[in-house]
C-alpha cells in the first residue's frame, strides 16, 4: 500500500520550493498534500553569442567527454640507411623483413640516398636481411616492433665477393620519426605483471605521468564503469582507449570500457598495450588526456594454448579500520580464470586466436551509516536545553515527540545503532553486507593473408557481467543496509581491417567497426508493497533526513543506456625520398538510447522547519520533524508525463594530414593538421527542447540542442627532431600544445540531468 506524507502546514499558505527535475518542474505548497507538475522540464543551453559558445559550454560541462580520436596506425614500420665502411650511402640494396611465426615478408630497395622504409607490420618479432652484389649479406634478428612505431635499423655493409651472411641480434631501437611520448608493454610483461584484478588500466600507471583514480565504487553516472586512469592530471574521461585502432570509449559519459567488476579484463588476449602521454601527431586528436592502445593477439603457424587461474581471498587479510572488533573479518573471495588457443587454419595464410576469461567475486563491504538510536525509535530525543540528560539510563530526561503512526513502517527500515552515539538522537550503524560479481569475456580473431602485400583481419569481443551491490554509497545513495542494486553490463566490440601495399611506397589501411554497449543499474526490491511514488507499482524511494544517512533506493535508479557507435576509417601513407606523408579520415555515427529518470520512486526531504515558523524542542530539529511526518519537500514524477526515454544521434567526422620531412641527415620536421566536425546532437523522435536564453525565452524551443555548432576545429602540429649521428639518436623535440573540442552529445546528457 502506498504511503504519502503530508507537507507541513502553517497559517499563511505559501510556496515552499520549486524543484526542476529531469522531466518535470514540481512545486510544493504548504497547504497541499501532493506534488503538482507545472510543466515539462527542458534541456538548457548557453545563449548564442558567437560560433564558439558551444565550445565554452562544453568545457564547463560537469560530465565532460572528449570526443572521438582518430587512431594512429596499429602497424609498425622499419626505416633505415645503408652505408659502406667509409660512411658512403649505398643505393639499390635489397632489404627484406620477415616474421617466422606468420611467414609475412616485406621487401624494398634503398634509394639514391641509401634510405629504405618498410611498412605494414603487425606488432611482433622480425628479422631484416640486407644484400647486394659485392657486399656481404647482413641479417639482423630479434627486432621487436610495437604498434604505430617506426624503428630505425641502420646497417653498414662490408665489401666482400664471397657469399657470406653476417647475423647479429638487434639492439633496442628508438622511434625517431615522431615526437610522441609513449611507452609499450609487450605480451610477456602483460602475462607476468602482478596486476590487481588483471586490469588493463593497471598497466597504464607504470608509465610516467599516469596516475590511477581512487579505487572507490563505480559511479552511478558512469553506468558501473570504473578502472580509470588520469594522464598528465587530466580527467579520466579524457583518456581515449583504442582496441585494434578502434575507439572503445563510452560515447555518452566518456568512460573507458569495463564491466560491472570495474576492471577491463582480457590482458591474456593482448599482444601489446601502448600508452601515449603527450605531443601526439595529427592522427590523434579530440582528447585532452592521453591514449591507451591495446592490440589483440593473432595466431601463427604453430598451435599454442594456455589455461590459468588466479585465486585470492581474505585468509591473511587484516581488519579494516572501520570493522567492528566483535565481528569477523568481512568475507572476500575472488577467482579469475581463463583459457586461450591459437594456431593456423591454413599454413602461412589463415590464422585464428580465441580467448576466454572469467571473473567471480564475493566481497563484504564495511559501511557506516548515521541512523536514529533506540530512544529515537520511541520518540525520545535530547532536549535543546540539556541534551546530556537524555540517555538510556535516564530516559526521563528526554523530550517526548509524538511519532506519527504512518512512520512505523519507515522506522522499521532503520536498524538500531551499534556504534558511537552522536548525542542528538542518532548514532553509527556499522554493517558488512555481501556483494557478488560475475563477469565473462570472450575474444575471437581471424587473420587472413591474401599475399605478402595484402592482409585482412576480423575481431569480435564480448564482455557480459552483473554485480549485486549491497550499498549504493555514492551520492545520491545510502549506506543503510537493505537497499541493494543490481548492475548489468554487456559490451560488444567488432572490427574488420583491410591492409594492403598499393605500391612499394604506398600503404593503405581501411577499417570498419561497431561498438555496442548496454549498461543498467536497477533496484532490487527488498520491500515489496512499500512505496512513496506517485506512479503505481514502484519500489520504495528515498528519505533524506538532514544530519543522517540517506535511507532507501537512490533517486537516480533505474539508470541505463544502450549506445551503438559505427566507425569507418581509412588511412593512406606514402613514402618518397625525403617525405613520409599520411592522410586519414574517420566517420563515426553515435546512437544512444535510454531514460534519464530522477525521483521516479519519490524522494522526501526532512530538515529544520524553524525558518518556516515551526517550533522545535530538541537539539535535532530535522529528526524531530521527521518523527512528526513533516517534510520540507517531495520530489516525484507526474503520472501523466512520465516518459523520459530519449534516442540521441550525432555524427563526428575527422580528417588529418601529416608529413614527416627529412630536411638533412640530422634534422627532420614533423608537421600536421587535423580537422574535426561535430554535428548538432538531435533526438530521433523530436523529443528534445531547449531554453536557449533563460533571461528572454518565454518557453522552451523544440529542436536540436544548440543553435549553432563549432565549425572551425583545426588543430595544427609541429615537431622538430634531430639526431647526433646517422645512428639516429634523438637530441631534441618540440611540439606546441593543442586542445580539441569535446563531444557535444555528452554535453546534452549532462544538461539533461
Language-model features, listed with the residues they occupy:
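Surface-exposed extracellular loop regions of Gram-negative outer-membrane beta-barrel proteins
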Residues: 518-520, 679, 685, 728-753
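Transmembrane beta-barrel strands of outer-membrane/channel proteins
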Residues: 170, 307-313, 354-358, 458-462, ...
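Feature marks flexible
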Residues: 368-439, 474-479, 526-561, 586-660, ...
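Residues on the lipid-exposed face of transmembrane beta-strands in outer-membrane beta-barrel proteins
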Residues: 231, 294, 339-343, 444-448, ...
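Hydrophobic, lipid-facing positions within transmembrane beta-strands of outer-membrane proteins
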Residues: 227, 269, 288-290, 335-339, ...
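Periplasm-facing N-terminal accessory domains of Gram-negative outer-membrane beta-barrel systems
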Residues: 26, 43-45, 51-183, 268, ...
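Acidic, glycine-rich flexible loop segments
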Residues: 164, 172-228, 235-282, 286-293, ...
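N-terminal secretory signal peptides that target proteins for export/translocation
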Residues: 1-53
Amino acid at each position: 500500500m502506498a504511503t504519502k506524507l503530508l507537507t507541513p502546514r502553517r497559517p499563511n499558505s505559501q510556496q515552499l520550493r520549486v524543484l526542476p527535475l529531469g522531466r518535470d518542474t514540481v512545486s510544493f505548497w504548504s497547504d497541499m498534500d501532493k506534488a503538482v507538475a507545472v510543466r515539462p522540464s527542458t534541456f538548457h543551453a548557453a545563449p548564442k553569442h558567437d560560433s564558439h559558445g558551444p565550445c565554452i559550454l562544453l568545457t564547463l560541462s560537469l560530465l565532460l567527454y572528449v570526443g572521438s580520436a582518430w587512431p594512429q596506425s596499429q602497424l609498425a614500420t622499419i626505416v633505415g640507411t645503408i652505408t659502406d665502411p667509409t660512411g658512403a650511402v649505398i643505393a639499390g640494396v635489397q632489404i627484406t623483413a620477415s616474421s617466422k611465426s606468420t611467414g609475412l615478408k616485406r621487401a624494398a630497395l634503398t634509394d639514391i640516398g641509401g634510405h629504405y622504409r618498410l611498412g605494414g607490420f603487425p606488432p611482433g618479432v622480425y628479422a631484416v636481411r640486407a644484400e647486394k652484389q659485392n657486399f656481404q649479406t647482413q641479417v639482423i634478428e630479434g627486432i621487436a616492433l610495437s604498434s604505430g612505431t617506426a624503428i630505425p635499423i641502420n646497417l653498414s655493409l662490408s665489401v666482400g665477393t664471397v657469399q657470406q651472411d653476417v647475423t647479429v641480434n638487434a639492439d633496442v631501437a628508438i622511434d625517431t620519426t615522431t615526437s610522441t611520448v609513449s611507452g609499450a608493454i609487450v605480451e610477456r610483461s602483460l602475462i607476468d605483471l602482478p596486476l590487481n584484478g588483471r586490469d588493463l588500466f593497471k598497466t597504464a600507471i607504470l608509465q610516467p605521468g599516469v596516475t590511477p583514480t581512487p579505487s572507490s565504487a563505480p559511479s552511478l553516472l558512469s553506468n558501473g564503469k570504473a578502472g580509470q586512469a588520469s594522464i598528465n592530471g587530466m580527467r579520466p574521461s579524457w583518456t581515449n582507449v583504442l582496441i585494434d585502432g578502434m575507439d572503445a570509449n563510452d560515447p555518452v559519459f566518456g568512460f573507458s570500457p569495463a564491466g560491472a567488476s570495474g576492471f577491463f579484463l582480457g590482458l591474456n588476449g593482448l599482444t601489446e598495450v601502448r600508452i601515449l602521454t603527450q605531443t601526439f601527431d595529427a592522427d590523434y586528436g579530440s582528447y585532452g588526456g592521453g591514449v591507451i592502445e591495446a592490440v589483440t593477439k593473432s595466431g601463427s603457424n604453430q598451435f599454442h594454448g594456455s589455461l590459468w587461474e588466479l585465486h585470492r581471498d581474505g585468509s591473511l587479510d587484516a581488519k579494516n579500520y572501520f570493522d567492528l572488533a566483535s565481528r569477523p573479518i568481512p568475507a572476500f573471495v575472488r577467482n579469475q580464470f581463463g583459457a586461450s588457443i591459437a594456431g593456423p587454419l591454413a599454413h602461412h595464410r589463415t590464422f585464428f586466436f580465441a580467448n576466454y576469461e572469467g571473473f567471480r567475486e564475493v566481497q563484504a563491504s564495511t559501511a557506516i551509516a548515521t541512523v536514529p538510536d533506540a530512544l529515537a525509535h520511541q520518540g525520545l530525543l535530547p532536549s535543546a536545553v540539556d541534551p546530556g540528560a537524555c540517555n538510556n539510563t535516564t530516559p526521563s530526561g528526554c523530550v517526548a515527540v509524538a511519532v506519527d503512526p504512518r512512520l512505523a513502517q519507515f522506522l522499521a527500515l532503520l536498524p538500531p545503532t551499534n556504534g558511537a552515539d552522536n548525542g542528538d538522537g542518532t548514532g553509527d550503524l556499522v554493517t558488512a553486507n555481501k556483494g557478488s560479481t560475475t563477469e565473462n569475456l570472450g575474444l575471437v580473431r581471424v587473420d587472413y593473408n591474401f599475399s605478402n602485400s595484402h592482409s585482412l583481419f576480423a575481431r569480435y569481443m564480448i564482455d557480459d557481467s552483473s554485480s549485486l551491490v549491497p550499498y549504493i554509497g555514492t551520492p545520491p545513495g545510502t549506506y543503510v543496509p537493505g537497499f541493494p542494486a543490481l548492475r548489468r553490463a554487456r559490451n560488444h566490440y567488432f572490427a574488420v581491417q583491410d591492409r594492403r601495399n598499393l605500391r612499394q611506397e604506398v600503404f593503405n589501411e581501411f577499417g570498419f567497426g561497431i561498438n555496442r554497449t548496454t549498461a543498467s543499474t536497477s533496484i532490487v526490491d527488498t520491500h515489496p508493497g512499500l512505496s512513496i511514488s506517485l506512479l503505481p507499482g514502484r519500489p520504495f524511494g528515498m528519505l533524506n533526513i538532514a544530519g543522517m544517512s540517506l535511507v532507501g533506493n537512490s533517486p537516480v535508479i533505474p539508470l541505463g543506456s544502450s549506445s551503438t557507435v559505427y566507425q569507418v576509417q581509412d588511412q593512406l601513407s606514402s613514402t618518397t625520398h625525403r617525405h613520409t606523408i599520411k592522410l586519414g579520415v574517420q566517420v563515426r555515427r553515435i546512437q544512444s538510447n535510454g531514460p534519464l529518470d530522477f525521483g521516479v520512486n519519490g524522494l522526501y526531504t526532512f530538515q529544520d522547519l524553524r525558518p518556516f515558523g515551526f517550533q522545535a524542542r530538541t537539539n535535532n530539529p530535522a529528526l524531530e520533524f521527521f518523527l512528526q511526518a513533516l517534510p520540507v519537500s517531495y520530489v516525484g514524477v507526474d503520472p501523466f508525463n512520465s516518459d523520459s526515454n530519449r534516442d540521441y544521434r550525432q555524427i563526428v567526422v575527422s580528417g588529418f594530414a601529416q608529413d614527416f620531412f627529412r630536411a638533412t641527415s640530422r634534422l627532420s620536421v614533423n608537421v600536421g593538421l587535423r580537422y574535426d566536425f561535430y554535428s548538432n546532437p538531435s533526438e530521433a523522435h523530436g523529443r528534445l527542447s531547449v531554453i536557449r536564453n533563460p533571461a528572454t525565452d518565454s518557453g522552451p524551443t523544440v529542436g536540436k540542442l544548440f543553435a549553432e555548432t563549432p565549425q572551425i576545429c583545426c588543430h595544427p602540429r609541429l615537431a622538430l627532431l634531430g639526431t647526433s649521428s646517422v645512428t639516429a639518436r634523438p637530441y631534441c623535440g618540440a611540439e606546441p600544445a593543442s586542445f580539441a573540442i569535446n563531444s557535444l552529445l555528452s554535453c546534452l546528457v549532462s544538461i539533461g540531468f
